[in-house]
């Protein structure tokens, strides 16, 4: 199966008023995500994984002790992560389905507590990675975080919400030059 870079389900500038500028989206989707697709397709050619599903490739190539050296896993997994990411957000505020709200309240005590836990997971991810709301194999909801391109598929979990905490997802919109002091000529 060839990896395909999906079109965004909204205009490239649709998230600007929510903190993700058109420039960030162009870099994130059109450059970073596209690179995962292109690299993944090149690495998959002629391998046993070439005609497998994304999930089969992710599960079959995941090895926690050698993730950093596994180009197929990293590129395919990051492609999967980003395909989920683009679908999980949008420009319009949509109410949470009552079934999900009830499950979150049951699992975390309240929606606000879930939001706190989710934001904390993203903020405390050391280095690059993702934070997730997942449905575990036993049906319970959990907030997790994963390093690099690792995702819930690796652990038999279902991703309900994911947040990319790699620098490329926010660095353009969070750069502040106010702390810089330029040298002056003597």
Can you name each region flagged by the protein language model?
Residues 46-51, 64-135:
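All-alpha RGS (Regulator of G-protein Signaling) helical domain and cognate RGS-like helical scaffolds
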Residues 18-32, 55-80, 148-150, 155-163:
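Alpha-helical scaffold segments that form or flank carboxylate-/histidine-based iron centers
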Residues 178-184:
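Conserved small/polar residues in nucleotide/adenosyl-binding loops
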Residues 1-12:
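Acidic, low-complexity proline/glycine-rich segments
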Residues 143-146:
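Catalytic Cys-His active-site segments of thiol-dependent hydrolases/isopeptidases
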Residues 38, 42:
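Aromatic-residue-lined binding/catalytic grooves and analogous aromatic/hydrophobic interfacial grooves
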Residues 128-130, 140, 160:
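Extracellular structured ligand-interaction cores
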């Amino acid at each position: 199966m060839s990896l395909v870079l999906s079109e965004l389900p909204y205009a490239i500038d649709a998230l600007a008023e929510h903190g993700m500028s058109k420039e960030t989206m162009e870099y994130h989707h059109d450059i970073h995500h596209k690179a995962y697709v292109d690299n993944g397709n090149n690495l998959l050619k002629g391998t046993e994984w070439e005609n497998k599903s994304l999930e089969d490739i992710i599960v079959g190539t995941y090895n926690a002790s050698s993730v950093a050296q596994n180009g197929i896993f990293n590129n395919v997994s990051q492609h999967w992560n980003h395909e989920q990411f683009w679908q999980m957000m949008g420009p319009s505020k949509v109410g949470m389905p009552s079934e999900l709200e009830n499950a979150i309240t049951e699992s975390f005590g309240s929606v606000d507590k879930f939001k706190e836990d989710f934001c904390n997971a993203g903020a405390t991810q050391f280095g690059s990675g993702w934070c997730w709301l997942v449905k575990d194999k036993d049906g319970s909801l959990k907030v997790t975080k994963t390093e690099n391109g690792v995702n819930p598929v690796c652990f038999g979990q279902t991703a309900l919400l994911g947040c990319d905490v790699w620098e490329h997802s926010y660095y353009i919109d969070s750069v502040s030059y106010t702390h810089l002091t330029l040298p002056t000529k003597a």
